[in-house]
């Protein structure tokens, strides 16, 4: 079986593997230069300035958030063509009610899609989440008032204050989960009612405890989220660990990482391994959880059934190469990771 993923460092990389083979790395977009050199063209010739978030869209294209140039890019994986779908390239906060491509964004960190194909973008420095309508390409703010802070629980999400939100995840029941990292909380927006609430975290900055109720208890630096049915998977940047929240019971379960920064534990239990500032997380086939272990410059895989962790890409020194086995390739602070639904 062929398996492919996309990860973001300064360039987008793709991994492929057959059952009996090592993972292989290949660049699919970007150059080694971050400067803006155009909105459209062959992906391997277009510069991508600080690509952080990646996601496969409902059209099977790869969507990339370009933090440095405040845009969302679309990579047609069939043709290799790269284009801009949101953001005019200027830093700011404007454009609601108009075309997404004309809007000013401010450090878009992640992109996700709802079941109807509408795009959601979290803007870290605008402290908001915006929605781009699939049919009209109209952009609107759905969470955050543009001011940094903490307020709004129990009220309208558009009137709430967030603090440098980094990651979002969407469930199938109209819920948007937000890694409100500056507030050390995870918040949920009900799309149907427009109401926001905190479902995990507090003002106290320390690691959670295994089996602890999520609401009202600390959760240290939630940086990346992904959702799978009743489970919300969480990477803690300051907490150097991975957690699972049972959304029905509201309980946190420890998955990986001791909470101490470092690099150790491959081949053993993930809970006793060391991570260093993980900033990306994604579920894959075979009950695999993939983690961008950013400050270790590697991608790691957690087997959810066995609880064993392994490194599948990166050798720890920073810098990026391609066309080699995953365990021989150097990465440079990988941030985003995603796995296509069809394994490509």
Language model segments and positions:
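Residue-level detector of Asp-centered blade-edge/turn motifs that repeat once per structural unit
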Residues: 56-59, 113-116, 170-173, 227-230, ...
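Gly/Pro-rich loop segments of beta-rich domains
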Residues: 22-50, 79-107, 136-164, 193-221, ...
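Conserved beta-propeller blade signature
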Residues: 61-63, 118-120, 175-177, 231-234, ...
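A short loop-to-beta-strand structural motif that recurs across blades of beta-propeller domains
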Residues: 70-74, 81, 127-131, 138, ...
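Short loop/turn segments immediately following the C-termini of beta-strands
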Residues: 67, 124, 181, 237, ...
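Bacterial N-terminal signal peptides
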Residues: 4-14
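Boundary at the C-terminal end of the N-terminal hydrophobic targeting segment
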Residues: 17-21
């Amino acid at each position: 079986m062929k398996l492919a993923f996309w990860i973001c460092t300064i360039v987008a990389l793709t991994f492929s593997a057959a059952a009996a083979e090592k993972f292989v790395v290949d660049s699919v977009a970007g150059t080694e230069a971050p400067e803006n050199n155009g909105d459209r063209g062959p992906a391997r010739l277009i510069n991508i300035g600080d690509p952080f978030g990646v996601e496969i869209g409902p059209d099977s294209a790869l969507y990339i958030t370009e933090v440095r140039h405040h845009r969302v890019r679309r990579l047609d994986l069939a043709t290799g063509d790269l284009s801009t779908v949101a953001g005019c390239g200027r830093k700011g906060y404007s454009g609601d009610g108009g075309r997404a491509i004309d809007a000013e964004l401010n450090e878009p960190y992640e992109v996700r899609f709802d079941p109807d194909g509408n795009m959601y973008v979290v803007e870290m420095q605008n402290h908001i989440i915006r929605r781009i309508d699939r049919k009209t390409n109209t952009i609107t703010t759905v969470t955050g008032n543009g001011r940094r802070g903490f307020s709004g629980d129990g009220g309208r999400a558009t009137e709430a204050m967030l603090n440098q939100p980094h990651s979002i995840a969407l469930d199938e029941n109209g819920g948007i989960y937000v890694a409100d990292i500056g507030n050390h909380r995870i918040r949920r927006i009900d799309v149907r009612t427009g109401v926001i609430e905190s479902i995990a975290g507090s003002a106290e900055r320390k690691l959670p405890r295994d089996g602890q109720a999520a609401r009202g208890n600390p959760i240290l630096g939630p940086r990346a989220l992904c959702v799978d049915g009743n489970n919300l998977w969480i990477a803690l940047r300051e907490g150097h660990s991975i957690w699972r929240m049972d959304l029905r019971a509201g309980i946190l379960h420890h998955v990986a990482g001791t909470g101490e920064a470092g690099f150790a534990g491959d081949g053993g239990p993930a809970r006793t391994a060391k991570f260093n500032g993980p900033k990306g997380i994604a579920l894959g086939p075979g009950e695999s959880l993939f983690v961008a272990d950013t400050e270790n410059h590697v991608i790691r895989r957690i087997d959810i059934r066995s609880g064993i962790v392994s490194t599948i890409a990166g050798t720890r020194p920073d810098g990026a190469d391609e066309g080699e086995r995953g365990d021989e390739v150097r990465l440079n602070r990988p941030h985003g990771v995603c796995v296509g639904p069809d394994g490509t």
